[in-house]
C-alpha cells in the first residue's frame, strides 16, 4: 500500500487548493489539487490553461505513490478552484435572502391551502404534506419527493410563484 493510501482524509485535506506534484504508476502529474475522494483516495487536479480554459485530471488513488506540495497558492487561486464546477447561473444567497425566500414561499403555499411545515435543526427545510421537502434556495429544483405527481405539481406551483414575484 502506498504512502498516499495510508494517509487519512484529514491528512489529504492539507493538500487541497495547493499546487502539487503527483507521482502515480511511473507517471508524473502537476496541478492544483481540487479534492480527494475520502473512500478511494482518488485525486482531482486542475490546471489553468493560457487560453482561459481548464484542464481537469482524475488520478486513481490506488495508483498514487507520492504527493508533494509545490506551492501554497493565494486567495485568488483558491476562489477560482472553489468555483470550478459551479454553474454560471449559480449565485450565493445571504442568510437574510434565504429567510425571506423561505417565508415568502411558505406564506404563499399556506395561502393556497397547501399544508406546509418547517423541519430540520435550523427549520430551513420546508415540508409539504409530509411527502415533499424544499431545501434552500427554495426553487423548483430544490424539491424532492418519491411521489412524482406531487413533485411535479409543487414544482410547477413554485415556478409560478417565482414568475409572479419577479
Swiss-Prot record:
Secreted as UniProt keyword: no
Keywords: Cytoplasm, mRNA processing, mRNA splicing, Nucleus, Phosphoprotein
Modified residues (Phosphoserine): 94, 165
Name of this protein: Gem-associated protein 6
InterPro entries: AD, Gemin6, Gemin6_C, Gemin6_Sm-like_dom, Sm
Domain AD, chain residue ranges per copy: 68-166
Domain of life: Eukaryota
GO aspect biological process, one term: spliceosomal snRNP assembly
UniProt entry tagged with the keyword Plastid: no
Molecular function terms, GO-annotated: RNA binding
Ranges where the Sm domain occurs: 4-73
Primary location: nucleus
Function: The SMN complex catalyzes the assembly of small nuclear ribonucleoproteins (snRNPs), the building blocks of the spliceosome, and thereby plays an important role in the splicing of cellular pre-mRNAs. Most spliceosomal snRNPs contain a common set of Sm proteins SNRPB, SNRPD1, SNRPD2, SNRPD3, SNRPE, SNRPF and SNRPG that assemble in a heptameric protein ring on the Sm site of the small nuclear RNA to form the core snRNP (Sm core).
Classification via PROSITE patterns: AD, SM
Localization per Swiss-Prot or TrEMBL: Nucleus, Nucleoplasm; Nucleus, Gem; Cytoplasm
Assembly behavior: Part of the core SMN complex that contains SMN1, GEMIN2/SIP1, DDX20/GEMIN3, GEMIN4, GEMIN5, GEMIN6, GEMIN7, GEMIN8 and STRAP/UNRIP. Part of the SMN-Sm complex that contains SMN1, GEMIN2/SIP1, DDX20/GEMIN3, GEMIN4, GEMIN5, GEMIN6, GEMIN7, GEMIN8, STRAP/UNRIP and the Sm proteins SNRPB, SNRPD1, SNRPD2, SNRPD3, SNRPE, SNRPF and SNRPG. Interacts with GEMIN7; the interaction is direct. Interacts with GEMIN8; the interaction is direct. Interacts with SNRPB, SNRPD2, SNRPD3 and SNRPE; the interaction is direct.
GO cellular component: cytosol; Gemini of Cajal bodies; nuclear body; SMN complex; SMN-Sm protein complex
Pfam families, A to Z: Gemin6, Gemin6_C
Amino acid at each position: 500500500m502506498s504512502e498516499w493510501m495510508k494517509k487519512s482524509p484529514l491528512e489529504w485535506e492539507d493538500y487541497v487548493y495547493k499546487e502539487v506534484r503527483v507521482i502515480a504508476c511511473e507517471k508524473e502529474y502537476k496541478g492544483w489539487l481540487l479534492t480527494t475522494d475520502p473512500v478511494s483516495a482518488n485525486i482531482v487536479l486542475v490546471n489553468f490553461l493560457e487560453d482561459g480554459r481548464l484542464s481537469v485530471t482524475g488520478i486513481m488513488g490506488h495508483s498514487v505513490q507520492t504527493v508533494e506540495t509545490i506551492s501554497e497558492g493565494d486567495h485568488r487561486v483558491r476562489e477560482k478552484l472553489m468555483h470550478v464546477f459551479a454553474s454560471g447561473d449559480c449565485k450565493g444567497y445571504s442568510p437574510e435572502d434565504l429567510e425571506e425566500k423561505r417565508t415568502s414561499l411558505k406564506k404563499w403555499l399556506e395561502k393556497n391551502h397547501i399544508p406546509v411545515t418547517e423541519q430540520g435543526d435550523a427549520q430551513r427545510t420546508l415540508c409539504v404534506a409530509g411527502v415533499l421537502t424544499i431545501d434552500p434556495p427554495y426553487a423548483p429544483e430544490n424539491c424532492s419527493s418519491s411521489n412524482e405527481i406531487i413533485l411535479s405539481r409543487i414544482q410547477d406551483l413554485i415556478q409560478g410563484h417565482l414568475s409572479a414575484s419577479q
